[in-house]
Amino acid sequence: CRAGFEKFWLEQAGYLVDVIRQDGSLDLAIRPNQLIAASLTYPILSQERAARMLSVVESKLLTPMGLRTLAPDHPEYQGVYGTGLAQADQYHRDITYHQGTVWPWLLGPWVNARVYAHAADSQSMAFIRSHLQPIIAHISNEGCIGSINEIFDGNAPHTPRGCVSQAWSVAELLRVLSEYPELT
């Protein structure tokens, strides 16, 4: 499996590409799916590569409410769900869903990848804890108390969107808080 991943790794850029097209060309878009390769029980990336990948992902995708689905400097980035239309129809919602929208559930794989790449020492856990505080405040005090919205805008102030109670978002936050009690 690791050998197959080699063709996805961009050595100079320090991250995994999301897509290799049929003609062999690479889609260089920075997306969060690469977190999975470092968040598994048996990670596919080395710790060194995971740390490099996290540096890119955290600088481009990490927000206070989760991870963007596309980096803001990409030409197809949509920072506001539904392209900012007050009454966005299904088409306008769909075209923005994977183009910059923030998904809170991705905080779970991010935490696992960060612990793998940087260990679970007090400094690393403090960094993670500080980045989880906004989503913990959201689940505790905002919207549907005890729940997390499905998505948030990619642009600040990261307005909550989608359904007001998304099980996979809640489950991933509860999972990492259970696995790493020092984060609470």
Predicted regions and their residues:
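Catalytic cores of carbohydrate-active enzymes
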Residues: C1-D73, Q78-G82, S130, I136-V170
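Structural helix-adjacent loops and short alpha-helical linkers that scaffold large soluble proteins
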Residues: T41-L54, R114-R129, S178-T184
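Hydrophobic alpha-helical segments
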Residues: A113, A117-A120, P134-I145, I151-G154, ...
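C-terminal substrate/ligand-recognition segments
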Residues: P72, E76-S124, L174-S178
